[in-house]
Amino acid sequence: MADTPNASGEPGELYLDAAATESVSPAVIEAMTPFLTEAYANPASVHQPGKTAARALDAARASFAAALGARPDDVIFTSGGTESDNLAIKGIAMARMRKLGLRPVCGFAEADGKQPANCRPRIIISAIEHPAVAQSAAWLHEWFGFEVVRIPVDAQAHLDLDALERELDGEASERTTMVSTMLANNEVGTVEPVEELVRIAHAHGVPIHVDAVQAAGQIPIRFRDWDVDALSVSGHKFGTPKGLGALLVRGRTPIEPVLSGGGQERGLRSGTQNVAGAVALAIGLNESNARMQAQYRELVASRDMLIDAVRRVAPRADLTGDPERRLPGHASFIFPGVTGEALLVDLDW
């Protein structure tokens, strides 16, 4: 939420769409500018300016990793959450398909002409995933015949853990390449029980990817402690320019690159590395984490005050998501008889 001053410099309209994107932090602009104007060399170059850029890239990677409870070698810098999700879904699913000896298009059994049921790869996602995940899974289905299993959620957008257990029982787990789920839902703000999801997936020998795009900078993320296999983040959600993100990937996790080229980022994301972008990600996330720690209670109180105020003036308004286990700065409502589009147009300036 941001206060937009009017022409006289006095407080004006409120920007209430920070869940979609935030403004770029002044600290981020200040930190990244030297790497756009002065220390702009390619970090792969062996000359001194290149070495200076490489040191800055390494420092940014270490700082960014620490802010997510990860190690520097877990971090693959990308162009944002969509690319991170695509790399995770397509890269892990394809690598696991080969590792499990599954075939992208099942043949027919010679005896009866029926398609063998035990050769088709599977991927499990939740029913409410972001299009970057859902469409990547659909791509696997369209081009390689993957079975896409969608786990339902309850009225508060919590994943059905029993349904996940059932989908991983028995022979099915041997064909399941991966599980992918959100950490926090961008539409309703519900936070999923990630440690329990990891426990269930790993109990069946299946890696799990977590889309943390909406959560990073809003709640603590402990990548290594949670034992997650891969995790996506996007910088524009925590004060960096758009087009910056990262995928955290454990070294144990089978994954294949989506982009081919010079072999940067552990060979998983080729392309000249964006030093200024990496610096921006590190500064933006650390700044957001510090603000979260200092203002968490205040933010929750403001959120709850807004929820109470809306309910007073619109008693029929329905708060979506979990009323307790939700992002600290997220409030989402359904107003019976009013479409979301009509409400937004009416509130827009």
Kindly give the residue locations of the regions a language model identified.
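Pyridoxal 5′-phosphate
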Residues: 1-349
